[in-house]
Design a protein with these regions (language model features):
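Extracytoplasmic/periplasm-facing segments of secreted or lipoprotein envelope proteins
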Residues: 32-71
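C-terminal motif of bacterial Sec signal peptides marking the signal peptidase cleavage site
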Residues: 3-6
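Functional cores of ribonucleases/endoribonucleases
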Residues: 86-119
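Short, low-complexity, Pro/Ser/Thr/Gly-rich segments in the mature regions of secreted, periplasmic
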Residues: 123-134
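A structural signal for short hydrophobic beta-strand segments in well-ordered beta-sheet cores
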Residues: 60, 120-122
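Bacterial signal peptide processing site
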Residues: 8-10
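Mature extracytoplasmic domains of secretory-pathway proteins
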Residues: 55, 59-99
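Post-signal peptide N-terminal segment of mature Sec-exported envelope proteins
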Residues: 16-35
Length: 134
């Protein structure tokens, strides 16, 4: 004996599917994963900048990067002006993702204000940010 089933059989096949990721609660694993993604993006930005040799400080500038939970940047990063159109959108992407991460996971920070550097100096081929205290 055989049972024939047609294509019009109405059976709900979606009952055991996992929930959409956006409906899942934030847990420790997803926070660790997102932090790892942020770390990877930050490292790729720093790697892109470090490929460039610093020979003339006038060819370099700096930008705020990241976001503290209570406001302000996490740090400043020096970059060569010649890659500004490539690097600034990536720095902004990282900063926005850090802000979203901070809000999503209720991250707290030390709220210490990171002062902007006053200039960039080339030391042994590497760009160094100079602050008022130096």
């Amino acid at each position: 004996m055989f049972t024939l089933v047609s294509c019009n059989t109405s059976k709900n096949a979606n009952t055991n599917l996992p929930k959409d990721i956006s409906e899942r609660p934030a847990d420790e694993d997803s926070q660790k994963y997102e932090q790892a993604q942020l770390d990877k993006l930050k490292a790729s930005i720093q790697s892109e900048v470090s490929k460039e040799k610093c020979t003339a400080a006038s060819e370099w500038t700096f930008a705020p990067m990241g976001a503290k939970a209570c406001g302000g940047p996490q740090q400043y990063i020096a970059y060569p002006k010649k890659i500004e159109t490539i690097i600034l959108p990536r720095i902004e992407e990282y900063t926005q993702k850090v802000k979203a991460f901070n809000e999503k996971y209720n991250i707290t920070s030390d709220c210490m204000m990171v002062m902007p550097p006053t200039s960039v100096k080339c030391i042994n081929g590497k760009a160094q940010l100079i602050t008022a205290e130096q």
